[in-house]
């Protein structure tokens, strides 16, 4: 479920970004600036995510990532009208998002191993299928909700200056909802304890496989 919230965060941030740049900052050209900073930072943190994972485990690394994402989005909720602050927030969101993405596939794989440990059946191919499904669901959900919020706020693409209700709606889609997704994901991870028992799970599975091959 936490991975779904991370996907929602990404989908809303990307889906509402262009609307936000035009409706709040006044120019769609600004979107490329803060979006590029986020993408580059996320790519870098994705490649170094193994460092905190090795030191603190997948659960704690994801919680660190969610915290950094929440800080970036929280600052954005307050000072999102300022391009410089928005770029700073984008760097923070990219840093945290890279950690979250780096952990995501690992958590799905661990869950599959846990299922095999509990049931004796390994669900081959479920990991990639799950991530693909979650990505599609989050993108579709985000697109629908962003469109609905824009419609409710009276957003008009052809208008240079949006009304106050439309601007608030853009902030909801681009800042407030992503912040809530980070918070919900963090709360769920508090109750995640698979990291603690996973070494035993791996040992048990290895023993079963050895016995099966004898």
What are the language-model segments listed below?
Residues 1-214:
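Membrane-embedded alpha-helical bundles of multi-pass transporters/translocases
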């Amino acid at each position: 479920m936490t991975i779904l919230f991370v996907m929602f965060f990404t989908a809303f941030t990307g889906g509402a970004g262009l609307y936000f740049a035009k409706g709040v900052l006044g120019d769609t050209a600004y979107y490329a600036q803060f979006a590029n900073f986020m993408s580059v930072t996320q790519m870098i943190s994705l490649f170094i995510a193994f460092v905190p994972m090795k030191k603190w485990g997948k659960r704690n690394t994801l919680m660190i990532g969610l915290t950094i994402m929440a800080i970036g989005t929280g600052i954005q909720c307050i000072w999102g009208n300022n391009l410089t602050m928005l770029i700073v927030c984008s760097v923070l969101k990219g840093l945290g998002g890279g950690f979250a993405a780096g952990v995501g596939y690992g958590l799905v794989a661990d869950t599959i191993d846990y299922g095999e440990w509990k049931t004796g059946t390994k669900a081959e191919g479920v990991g990639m299928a799950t991530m693909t499904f979650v990505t599609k669901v989050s993108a579709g959900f985000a697109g629908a909700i962003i469109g609905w919020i824009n419609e409710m706020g009276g957003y008009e693409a052809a208008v240079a200056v949006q009304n106050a209700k439309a601007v608030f709606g853009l902030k909801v889609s681009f800042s407030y909802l992503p912040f809530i997704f980070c918070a919900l994901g963090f709360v769920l991870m508090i109750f995640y304890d698979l990291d603690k028992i996973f070494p035993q799970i791996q040992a048990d599975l290895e023993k079963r496989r050895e016995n099966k091959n004898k």
